[in-house]
Amino acid sequence: MDRAVGEMRDFAWLASAAVPTTSPGAPGANPFDQARIAARELGRMTGAPHHDVLVVLGTGLIGAADHLGAGGAPIDLTSLPWFARFTGPGHRPEAWSVDLEGKRTLIVAGRLHLYEGRSPAEVVHPVRTAIAAGARTVVLTCSAGAVNPRLSLGDVVAIRDHLNLTGTSPLAGTTTDSERPRHVDMTDAWSPHLRALARSVASIEEGVYAQMPGPQLETPAEIRMLAALGADLVGMSTVPEAIAARHLGADVLGLAVVTNAAAGPRAGPLDVDEVVRVASGSSPAVAKVVAGVVRSLDPVGAPGTARREARPAVSGGDEAETAPR
């Protein structure tokens, strides 16, 4: 009980700060302060003083929400400060706050992508907001192309490591507070403990995920390059969110659904509708893994063997500025 109270206090201090009224990533903006203000509004809208877990549903995986207990009208995320409308296929700016296996869980029905013309800070704003609201565990799901020929359509793969080939980072230019290091250790970016929990729930593979900037698909030469670099999967999302979450001390689980063969001898022309269809068919399997992992978490949403880290990097005064609508 004492540990739970202490961990909640670590995140409860994220409740006040003055922030600029510019969008995340804009000159002069403090994205951490903006996340705190959005978290306060999230608490007001949901009636939940804190959240333990964040689950982000990728392309075509919105059906997993039903299997995770989402019901009733979702929250309109665009009504939260600095949340932009998702425009990717199969993504909706909606969320549900649910009790999942005894943990208060925020389920988000999509995400922003860099290819939508958004800054890295805008892309990771939902993740930072959930962590400011108390989430210690972040589950990121996505659809991906198979670089490794051993993978089959519909497979659920736990992300073991990643290649960030976007040429950018959500930490660039934003980390000036001494509470958190600018140079974050990414050795265990994808929690080994959470991956072990996922494998205990279902027989799933692990793999290395490469993020390309998109929106164009990869060329055969690029896929050969990715294979040579050790990638098993390729997609256009997820890595910035993982970086941002690790920077703030949260534990991250990544689950990728193989929705197509990447460019090469096995691949035909990609039909986005087909990607959504394949992902949708794997939604129950993804939900099963997520629910099983969350069931094994302690009451504050962190695995029992998780590392306890310093408080997230935020700065600002004690007075809160009214957020723009």
What do these predicted ranges mean?
Residues 162-216:
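Histidine/lysine/aspartate-rich catalytic loop segments that bind and position anionic ligands
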Residues 136-137, 232, 251:
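Short acidic/polar active-site loop segments enriched in Thr and Asp
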Residues 236-274:
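Zn-dependent metallopeptidase/amidohydrolase metal-coordination segment
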Residues 195-196, 200-232, 290, 297-300:
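Active-site/ligand-binding-proximal alpha/beta "capping" segment
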Residues 2-186:
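Metabolite-binding pocket within alpha/beta catalytic cores that recognizes anionic/polar moieties
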Residues 263-312:
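His/Asp/Glu-rich mid-to-C-terminal helical/loop segments that flank catalytic regions of hydrolases
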Residues 130-134, 227, 246:
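Non-catalytic positions within long, well-ordered alpha-helices that form the structural scaffold/packing
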